[in-house]
Regions:
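A penicillin-recognizing enzyme superfamily signal
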Residues: 7-184
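Conserved short loop/turn motifs at secondary-structure junctions
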Residues: 1-7
Length: 184
């Protein structure tokens, strides 16, 4: 399933990528809404969402059941989360990757660009080992953003500016390599 091929909210995407960044653990997401007045005084910030944290998981008999999961619960094997994250980091680290601008942060970053049909929406969801952020650019109505307005061009610069500020006083962290993962 490619980003932009079916309706998925920014909330859902960011929450999913947080599982990779946290070595397979469920993370209770926050919408970060910041409202500043004309003097740049912060009027509103972080709101924690705690409603409807049910997740579909498969039990040993391969049937689906609703099981309540809490913040920090291991919902994906560490090795699986690491391998997925390692692949997603390629979007940033590869010289022609659509997220290559994020290399500017000079730290390990995973991320994925996304553009819906006819440039109606542009996304970038990216993460370091300790922070996951998603950016969506688009209109509430079905108006296109314009030719060439992709996730890498429209959303990634916003994400990058935010992450530069958010991570500037934090140490550079590596994604932890779980037991059983070896590099040749």
């Amino acid at each position: 399933l490619g980003l932009g091929s079916s309706p998925v909210s920014l909330f859902e995407l960011t929450r999913a990528y947080a599982i990779f960044a946290s070595s397979g653990k469920l993370v209770v997401p926050k919408y970060i809404r910041s409202v500043h007045d004309r003097d740049n005084e912060l009027l509103l910030s972080s709101v924690v969402l705690r409603n409807n944290l049910e997740t579909q998981v498969q039990d040993s008999s391969e049937t689906q059941t609703n099981v309540k999961k809490a913040d920090g619960d291991q919902i994906l094997e560490e090795s699986e989360a690491f391998l997925a994250s390692h692949l997603i980091q390629g979007v940033v680290s590869h010289p022609r990757g659509t997220g290559r601008r994020a290399k500017k942060l000079k730290r390990p970053i995973g991320g994925k660009t996304g553009t819906t049909n006819e440039q109606g929406d542009a996304w970038f969801v990216g993460y370091s080992p300790n922070l996951v952020t998603g950016v969506w650019v688009g209109f509430d109505s079905k108006i296109g953003l314009g030719r060439g307005e992709t996730g890498g061009r429209a959303a990634l610069p916003i994400w990058l500016e935010y992450m530069e500020s958010a991570l500037q006083n934090h140490p550079v962290l590596e994604f932890p390599v779980p037991e059983g993962i070896f590099f040749a």
